[in-house]
Amino acid sequence: MFKTILLAYDGSDHAKRAAAVAKAEAQAHGARLLVVHAYEPVPDYLGEPFFEEALKRRLERAEKVRAEAMALTGVPREDALLLQGRPAEAILQAAIGEKADLIVMGTRGLGAVGSLFLGSQSQKVVAEAPCPVLLVR
């Protein structure tokens, strides 16, 4: 039934539970599991050298989250995508581009401080997704 399952992952407890569900679904269906982690762009108004430092920290954090997702799901690096942008938009673009048959994500994320999913991001994905969305609490 499912050929490609997209896991939206932000490192929150909800996302960790979603990772377990996505992994199980991928195994049950013999599907490819793709992990997407979206991070917010650094505001331009920071200026040098603050912009460079903020970008470096944001990328380091994103790499850490990706590594955690890879460890939880067993997906190879080429199937663990880091995308810059608003989480919902990045997830939706990845789902379309990768022809996802199912999106799995937590119902809530880490919030704006972590520059990751909010409940509103989950709602946007559900409303605009090109495929079914499985929300995990």
UniProtKB/Swiss-Prot annotation:
InterPro entries (alphabetical): Rossmann-like_a/b/a_fold (IPR014729), Universal_stress_UspA (IPR006015), UspA (IPR006016)
Top-level taxonomic group: Bacteria
Entry's family note: Belongs to the universal stress protein A family.
Name of this chain's protein: Universal stress protein in QAH/OAS sulfhydrylase 3'region
